[in-house]
C-alpha cells in the first residue's frame, strides 16, 4: 500500500489548552502503513491558509486542522473544489463544526478517526465574499464574538460574560430579509446562518433540521426579548430546541439577502468579519471533502 501524505497544521494558541502533545500523538497513533506524517505550526494570523495552499500544491492527500472553527475556516478555504480531504483534531473553544460531524473532542480519539479515512462531501456557506463552514451571523452575537476575540481569557465563561454585558445595552436592528421569493422585515437581536447546527459549547441551533450535506442553511432570526426570557432561551439552545421558542424563527434556505438599517457587526465561524449593512448569503453544495467517523 502506497503511503498518503498527511499534514497536521497546529494553531498553538487556539482554545484553552496548548497543543504541544499533538505531534507526539500523531506519530504515535497514525497508521504509518497508510500515512506519511508531516507537522506544521502556525506563526501568525493567516499562516494556516498559506500552509494549506502549499500542501495542496505539494500533493498532500489530507490536511488536518488542529484548532477551533476559525482554524478550520482558514485551512478548509484552500481545500474546497479539490480532492484533498480535511481532517480535524478539535482544539478550539467551541468546536461546533467538529461536534456536528461526530468527531471526538479528545485528541487521541480524533487522530484515530483519520486512520479510517471515511469521507463525506460537506456543504460550505458564503457570506458576501467570505466562506463559512459552521455558521455566520450578524448583530449582537457578532459583537460578542468581536469582543471575545480581543480577550486573552478563552472558554464558555468568558463568552457568557461578554454576552451578559452587551445584552443589557444592545439596541435591536431592523432587517429587511429576502429569501425563497419572500421579503419581510424583522427587528432582531441577531440573525445567524447555520451550516452545522452548532454554535459550539454543545449549544445547538435546530439540530433536527441541520444536515451538513443537504444544500440548505438554517437561518435563525432572534427577536428582542426581556432579560427574564433570556433565562429561558439559553437552556432551549443547550437542548437544541431554540426553534420552539416563540421569538425565534428558523427558516431553511439555500440563499438569502439581508439589509440592515445601519452597519452592524458580522462574524464568520466565531471570528470577527468586520461590519456591514448589506449581506448576501448562499450555500455551496458538497464542495468540501471531510474525514469523519465511519459509524
PLM features: what roles do these ranges have?
Residues 130-136, 185-186, 190-194, 199-200, ...:
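Short hydrophobic-aromatic micro-motifs
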Residues 71-84:
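Short Gly/Thr/Asp-enriched flexible loops that form oxyanion-binding sites at enzyme active sites
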Residues 171-173, 187-189, 213-218, 252-254:
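A generic structural signal for short beta-strands and their flanking turns/coil linkers
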Amino acid at each position: 500500500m502506497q503511503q498518503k501524505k498527511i499534514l497536521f497544521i497546529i494553531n498553538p494558541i487556539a482554545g484553552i489548552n496548548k497543543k504541544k502533545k499533538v505531534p507526539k500523538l500523531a506519530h504515535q497513533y497514525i497508521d504509518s502503513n497508510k500515512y506519511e506524517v508531516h507537522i506544521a505550526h502556525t506563526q501568525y494570523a493567516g499562516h494556516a491558509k498559506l500552509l494549506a495552499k502549499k500542501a495542496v500544491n505539494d500533493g498532500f492527500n489530507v490536511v488536518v486542522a488542529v484548532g477551533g472553527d476559525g482554524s478550520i475556516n482558514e485551512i478548509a478555504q484552500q481545500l474546497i473544489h479539490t480532492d484533498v480531504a480535511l481532517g480535524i483534531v478539535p482544539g478550539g473553544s467551541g468546536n461546533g463544526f467538529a461536534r456536528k460531524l461526530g468527531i471526538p473532542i479528545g485528541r487521541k480519539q480524533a487522530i484515530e478517526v483519520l486512520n479510517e479515512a471515511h469521507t463525506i462531501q460537506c456543504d460550505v456557506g458564503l457570506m458576501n465574499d467570505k466562506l463559512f463552514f459552521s455558521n455566520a451571523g450578524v448583530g449582537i452575537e457578532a459583537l460578542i464574538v468581536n469582543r471575545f476575540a480581543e480577550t486573552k481569557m478563552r472558554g464558555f465563561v468568558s463568552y457568557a460574560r461578554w454576552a451578559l454585558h452587551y445584552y443589557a445595552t444592545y439596541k435591536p436592528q431592523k432587517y429587511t430579509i429576502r429569501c425563497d421569493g419572500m421579503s419581510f422585515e424583522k427587528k432582531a437581536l441577531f440573525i445567524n446562518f447555520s451550516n452545522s447546527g452548532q454554535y459550539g459549547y454543545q449549544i445547538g441551533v435546530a439540530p433536527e433540521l441541520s444536515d451538513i450535506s443537504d444544500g440548505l442553511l438554517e437561518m435563525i432570526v432572534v427577536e428582542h426579548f426581556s432579560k427574564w426570557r433570556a433565562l429561558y432561551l439559553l437552556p432551549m439552545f443547550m437542548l437544541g430546541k431554540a426553534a420552539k421558542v416563540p421569538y425565534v424563527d428558523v427558516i431553511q434556505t439555500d440563499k438569502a439577502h439581508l439589509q440592515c438599517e445601519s452597519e452592524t457587526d458580522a462574524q464568520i465561524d466565531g471570528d470577527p468579519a468586520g461590519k456591514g449593512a448589506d449581506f448576501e448569503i448562499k450555500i455551496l453544495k458538497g464542495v468540501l471533502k471531510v474525514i469523519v467517523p465511519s459509524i
